[in-house]
Amino acid sequence: MSRPYYNPKPIRGGGPEAYIGVDHQLTEPWPEESSNVKLVAHSDLNGWGDAFQIQVGGGYCYVAASGVNGHDGMTILDVKDPANPKIVNQITDSPAARTHKVLRINDEVLITNSEIRPSFKDDPEVVGGLRIFDNTDPVHPKFINYIEVDGFGIHRPIYDRKRKLMYSSGFRDGYTGKVLLVHDMKDPWAPEFIGLGWLEGQKDGESPSWDPEIVGDGAWIHEGNPFGNYVTCGYWDSGIVMFDLTDPAKPEFMWRQNPHETHGWPGCYHTFLVPDGSEFAIVTHETTTVNCDHPPAFVTFYDMRN
């Protein structure tokens, strides 16, 4: 079996300019990776690349993008016939903030994130947090309001439909890096901030609970997912973390594991997810180098029965 394309000296970070114009050198999927999978349809989104998150409902598909090689904004497709997706609208957003995550809360409410790009941090017209849309007309969402949070805003919101709570990786004054923000979504038109969770060492005045030489400034939450009354979190270079949200207003840290520190595995923990009805978790890493030049990261499975 041939190995994927690999560059021993990958380009990492540097912002969007590092990605523009780079020749794509990735391999195609291996045959065994496409077992029992059939391509039904494809849309080039009119050249709007860099698709990040997709939500489908009511016969429409909402695709959020963040423009490195594409556009900042959202594409709406009619997918009533899944084999023939048709673009029905494209909404361009300001490049001042990333709005690359979209959530379809119900038939009427659509939410995107708003994460301010560092170079626009002092722009008074840029708001970080959540953006609320009236989606009564599913082809023409209408912006209603911002739900503002501190700092650069919110990176990745996840909606817990069973508990009507939203778990976001976002910023909070007095804390370093992104922390877990909890919003009450009983009124989806007006999300209410009710709780905050963090890793010891993120709050001002606390000592790091991680190895600073290995983790560096990578101790921050990327994503929080519901698992009953718990939230499972990919915590970037500091591994995976679980919080007890029996009281969502007072998230309690339970434990952290980080093979990046203990076993030299890759960092960039993206997602820690227990599928609904399962007793096993899936943990993924994110590739953070141009052209995915870094050696492939892992997909790990955890037994969550205890």
Q: Which residues are covered by each model-predicted region?
A:
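Feature marking well-ordered beta-strand scaffolds used for ligand recognition
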Residues: 1-306
